[in-house]
């Protein structure tokens, strides 16, 4: 007897290295989204760092979290599909984990499938310095994700896994949908992002992270009065810009592929 197969429409997108799968024409509130996403992300499947589900102008992330890079990817897809798009256009979208409408400025980057997308990011709820065991971390809270800033030069810790376990323990009595740890090198303005999504029950080292870069930008503004910086990511770059007390994240987006994915039920 044949197993049933679920057929989904997908678009694979590269926002600054943070490989993202967007699933179209699907119930964005389906209860199986976390399980489906886990299957889609596998190395033996489409192989990505995160999955989002899109309908009209809304993006629903796999764990109900907010994601800046997926939002930039979604707006770039809208430009890619927009017959009226030529060089530049602004797109208003919404994303899970964030109640406000997001404004994304999309520009062509030299090819039909390549864009630069600048998103106005949500403001943080709180910014503080905390101590976790003997380590000092920055903690920037947003409505859809909590980001920890770990300065690897200052803390001199070689085991990132140890820090991840300590942060999980720190958050054990809190309600949250996702957390990130930005392992930041202050010498060369580079970072290695780790993001854990509670609903999916796993975390990944991402090749870039827009909300994490936002958190780092707010942190650097507070600590070093730095309004703008290009932050080197493991597989690309993202620039944060603070203008008139608003935070923007800018960087490249490339539409890689689209087609159908087959998932065994």
Curated annotation (Swiss-Prot):
Catalytic activity from the UniProt record: L-histidine = D-histidine
Residues at the catalytic site: 67, 209
Superkingdom classification of source: Bacteria
Enzyme Commission code(s) on record: 5.1.1.24
Sequence intervals crossing the membrane: none
Activity regulation comment: Activity is not affected by buffer composition (PO(4) or Tris), ions (SO(4)(2-), Mg(2+) and EDTA) or the PLP inhibitor hydroxylamine. However, the activity is hindered by iodoacetamide and Hg(2+), which are known inhibitors of enzymes with catalytic thiols.
Keywords linked to the UniProt accession: Isomerase
Function, in words: Cofactor-independent isomerase that catalyzes the reversible conversion of L-histidine to D-histidine. Shows weak activity with L,L-lanthionine. The catalytic turnover is 10'000-fold faster with L-histidine than with L,L-lanthionine. May play a role in growth of F.nucleatum.
Note: Was originally proposed to encode a lanthionine epimerase that catalyzes the conversion of L,L-lanthionine to meso-lanthionine, the last step in the lanthionine biosynthetic pathway in this organism. However, the authors found low catalytic turnover and low catalytic efficiency, suggesting that L,L-lanthionine is not the physiological substrate for the enzyme.
Subunit and partners: Homodimer.
Family: Belongs to the histidine racemase family.
Protein name per the record: Histidine racemase
Provenance organism: Fusobacterium nucleatum subsp. nucleatum (strain ATCC 25586 / DSM 15643 / BCRC 10681 / CIP 101130 / JCM 8532 / KCTC 2640 / LMG 13131 / VPI 4355)
Originating gene: hisR
């Amino acid at each position: 007897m044949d197993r049933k197969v679920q057929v989904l429409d997908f678009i694979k997108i590269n926002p600054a290295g943070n490989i993202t799968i967007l699933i179209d024409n699907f119930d964005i509130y389906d209860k199986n989204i976390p399980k489906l996403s886990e299957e889609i992300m596998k190395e033996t499947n489409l192989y990505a760092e995160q999955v989002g589900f899109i309908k009209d102008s809304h993006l629903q992330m796999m764990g109900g979290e907010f994601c800046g890079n997926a939002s930039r990817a979604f707006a770039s897809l809208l430009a890619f599909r927009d017959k009226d798009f030529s060089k530049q256009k602004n797109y208003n979208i919404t994303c899970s984990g964030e109640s406000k409408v997001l404004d994304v400025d999309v520009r062509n980057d030299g090819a039909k499938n390549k864009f630069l997308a600048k998103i106005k990011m949500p403001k943080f709820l709180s910014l503080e310095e905390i101590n976790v065991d003997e380590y000092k971390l920055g903690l920037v809270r947003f409505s859809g994700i909590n980001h920890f800033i770990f300065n690897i030069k200052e803390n001199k810790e070689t085991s990132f896994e140890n820090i991840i376990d300590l942060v999980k323990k720190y958050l054990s009595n809190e309600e949250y949908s996702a957390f990130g740890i930005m392992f930041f090198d202050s010498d060369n303005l580079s970072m290695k992002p780790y993001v854990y999504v509670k609903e999916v029950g796993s975390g990944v080292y991402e090749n870039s992270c827009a909300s994490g870069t936002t958190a780092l930008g707010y942190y650097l503004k507070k600590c070093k009065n730095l309004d703008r910086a290009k932050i080197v990511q493991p597989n690309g770059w993202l620039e944060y810009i603070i203008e008139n007390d608003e935070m923007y994240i800018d960087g490249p987006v490339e539409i890689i592929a689209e087609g159908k994915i087959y998932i065994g039920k």
